[in-house]
A protein has these predicted regions:
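H-loop/switch region of ABC-family ATPase nucleotide-binding domains
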Residues: 212-213
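A short, surface-exposed alpha-helical micro-motif characterized by mixed small hydrophobic
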Residues: 218-220
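Catalytic Walker B motif of ABC-type/P-loop ATPase nucleotide-binding domains
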Residues: 177-180
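A short, proline-enriched helix->beta-strand linker immediately N-terminal to the Walker B motif
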Residues: 171-175
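Helix N-cap at the start of a conserved alpha-helix in ABC-type nucleotide-binding domains
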Residues: 188-190
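Conserved ABC ATPase signature
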Residues: 152-156, 160
Length: 260
């Protein structure tokens, strides 16, 4: 059973149709990279998957449960969508860290707010806080920032800030990680440190959907590659098959982007 199914997702902004019937599925532990020219709808697709945008048509399923159905208003209530959104961790192009908080506090903030909803929070506040701090330190260590827990965002490089953002997403223990061009805002020399973290997550069996222009990375780390153009899936295949020359449009695109 797929962990994620995207069924016939369409999205329009006014009269502009951005997504035109996108379907694909993802198994537990798989990594799927979504590639294609700018403007092909890749980011919009990610935002529809985790309901930051409401698809005009189609369904999103996690573990065979419909979490969004454009034809069913019951799945579109804000409270329900906020709960279902916790299936996903989302790492954006921009880091979106709170400048007034340390790296540690940025990672702890969302789970601390969630913990306050627990009926035992007042009684066990110190223990809950201590547990969350241990976990946050562990995730920062995992992304190579164990020595930066007390640093503020302005004291961190762009690559380090993006790694804090990855730790923050992991802290919520999502079933699926979504990455939207996570290196596009970085200086070239900082790109590799973020890609290494994402690759390590792939080796650990984290289920991921990655929108990226880093072609060599995508072909190295992915189980499947989805090539999008003009709001449609042109090809969904293994990296090996993509390289084989069986898909002329994909082959032309890869030549243009100088895949090694």
């Amino acid at each position: 059973m797929p962990i994620l199914e995207v069924k016939n997702i369409c999205k329009s902004f006014g009269s502009t149709e951005v997504l035109k019937g996108i379907s694909f599925s993802l198994e537990q532990g798989q990594v799927v990279s979504i590639i294609g020219s700018s403007g092909s709808g890749k980011t919009t697709l990610l935002r529809c998957i985790n309901m930051l945008e409401k698809a005009t048509k189609g369904q999103v399923l996690v573990n065979d449960e419909v979490i969004f159905d454009a034809a069913d208003p019951a799945t579109q209530k804000d409270r329900e969508m906020r709960k279902k959104r916790l299936h996903f961790g989302f790492v954006f192009q921009s880091f979106n860290l709170f400048p007034q908080y340390t790296a540690l506090k940025n990672v702890m903030l969302a789970p601390e707010l969630a913990a306050k909803e627990r009926p035992d929070y007042k009684q066990n506040r110190k223990e809950i806080h201590a547990q969350l701090e241990r976990e946050a330190r562990g995730y920062l260590e995992q992304v190579g920032l164990g020595d930066k827990v007390d640093n503020y965002p302005y004291q961190l490089s762009g690559g380090q800030q993006q790694r804090v953002a990855i730790a923050r997403a992991l802290m919520m223990r999502p079933q699926i990680m979504l990455f939207d061009e996570p290196t596009s805002a970085l200086d070239p020399e900082k790109v590799n440190e973020v890609l290494q973290v994402i690759e390590s997550l792939a080796h650990e069996g984290i289920t991921m959907v990655i929108v990226t222009h880093e072609m060599n990375f995508a072909f190295k780390v992915s189980d499947r590659i989805v090539f999008m153009e003009k709001g449609r899936v042109v090809c969904d295949d293994t990296p090996q098959a993509m390289r084989s020359g069986h898909h002329p449009r994909v082959e032309a695109f890869l030549k243009d982007v100088s895949l090694a």
